Curated annotation (Swiss-Prot):
Membrane topology term: Lipid-anchor
A GO-annotated cellular component: plasma membrane
Signal peptide: 1-18
Protein name from the UniProt record: Foldase protein PrsA
Gene Ontology annotations of biological process type: protein folding; protein transport
UniProt-annotated location(s): Cell membrane
Family: Belongs to the PrsA family.
GN (gene name): prsA
Keyword Lyase: no
Chain's role: Plays a major role in protein secretion by helping the post-translocational extracellular folding of several secreted proteins.
Annotated keywords: Cell membrane, Isomerase, Lipoprotein, Membrane, Palmitate, Rotamase, Signal
GO molecular function: peptidyl-prolyl cis-trans isomerase activity
Organism of this sequence: Geobacillus sp. (strain WCH70)
Domain PpiC: 133-223
Principal subcellular localisation of the protein: membrane
Amino acid sequence: MRKWMIVAAVAAVFGLSACNNGDSEVIVKTKDGNITKEEFYNEMKARVGKEVIRDLVHEKVLSKKYKVTDKEIDKEIENLKEMYGTQYDLVVQQNGEKAIRDMVKLDLLRQKAAMEDIKVTDKELKDYYKNYKPKIRASHILVKDEKTAEEIKTKLDKGEDFAKLAKQYSQDPGSAPNGGDLGWFGPGKMVKEFEDAAYKLKVGQVSDPVKTDYGYHIIKVTDKEEKKPFNEMKEEIEFEVKQSKLDPAKVQSKVEKLIKDAKVEIEDKDLQDVLK
């Protein structure tokens, strides 16, 4: 999260790239004194300039050799939304979608660089496909006690509206206002008891109460992705299998080698030790 904030904050610094030493253009006026473009630039550079220069160098060098598509970025964004929930929305409000997409793109470029040296077998890919479960979309009603859960299930069995009952009874503040909708999720995103029960349901089917550490859930699956044939998914599966084998040390080592080979020269004396 902090990285996204840094990217957004320093965008202003590089928006002032035309600014040179001695630029006295005033950007803030107060009765106690003004703030010039030069003062702003120097302060921002001192605070976060090294991190941003490093990221810009990485993006420039890696983009020459590796490509990241909008579709790949979109997929990672969806994963982040699932992972961070409402915190993700807060970061978007504070920093903007573009800053987040830029950081996701850079992370993917670094990963692709490191993945180049990772080998996977056809058996690994087929085993992954065999166990692969597509995403599903579900809603739930969460209550603390089994008795209430059973009473709600009885109402549902009699034809009462799921979304209406979720708004009325569910104690999940994140989903209750939306009729219990949890959005799309895949394996590993929910607690095991919830996931196991949800994946057994057909679209439109409602579960009996499911007990987890959070309480009792009544789950309704509202949509399911289809599992595509292996050949259509092979490239995506290969990426995910390689991604699962990555570790920070491999990524750092590969990127450092590529940066060294690119013979980067930093002219600003204040930032010359960034890549060391």
